[in-house]
């Protein structure tokens, strides 16, 4: 009876795994089992941090807006600013407001003066 050699599917899967894990350090880029485990961990971390990145950027925008607003007046806080924006029905999100705060502070000053009571 002739010998039947194994197929290429497992080798192709491991090659793909090696390409993914080639930048990992130590045994994590050399041994198949640890490569598999590290790949799972990397994908879990990537999934988790995609959500975390959204929260981090929102926090950064809020901090930037708050810093610029505190320069205008001592008693004018961020939450009051956002509340007045919604009351006046100005559709500016936090990302745009943070960019305005960085690049064009005078424009943000005029916006805050317009929406003050």
Swiss-Prot record:
InterPro entries: Ribosomal_bL20, RIBOSOMAL_L20_CS, Ribosomal_protein_bL20_C
Organism: Lepidium virginicum (Virginia pepperweed)
GO terms for MF: rRNA binding; structural constituent of ribosome
Gene3D superfamilies the record matches: 6.10.160.10, Ribosomal protein L20
Example of a GO cellular component annotation carried by this entry: chloroplast
Keywords assigned: Chloroplast, Plastid, Ribonucleoprotein, Ribosomal protein, RNA-binding, rRNA-binding
Family of this protein: Belongs to the bacterial ribosomal protein bL20 family.
Pfam families cross-referenced by the UniProt entry: Ribosomal_L20
Parts of the chain that traverse the membrane: none
Protein name: Large ribosomal subunit protein bL20c
HAMAP family (UniProt xref): Ribosomal_bL20
Localisation: Plastid, Chloroplast
UniProt record, GO biological process: ribosomal large subunit assembly; translation
Function: Binds directly to 23S ribosomal RNA and is necessary for the in vitro assembly process of the 50S ribosomal subunit. It is not involved in the protein synthesizing functions of that subunit.
Cross-referenced CDD domains: Ribosomal_L20 (cd07026)
């Amino acid at each position: 009876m002739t010998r039947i050699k194994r197929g290429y599917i497992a080798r192709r899967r491991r090659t793909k795994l090696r390409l993914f894990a080639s930048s990992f350090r130590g045994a994590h880029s050399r041994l198949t089992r640890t490569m598999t485990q590290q790949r799972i961990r990397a994908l879990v971390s990537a999934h988790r941090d995609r959500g975390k990145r959204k929260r981090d950027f929102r926090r950064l925008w809020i901090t930037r807006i708050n810093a610029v607003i505190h320069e205008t007046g001592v008693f004018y806080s961020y939450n009051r600013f956002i509340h007045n924006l919604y009351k006046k029905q100005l559709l500016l999100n936090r990302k745009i407001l943070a960019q305005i705060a960085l690049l064009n502070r005078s424009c943000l000053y005029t916006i805050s003066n317009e929406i003050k009571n």
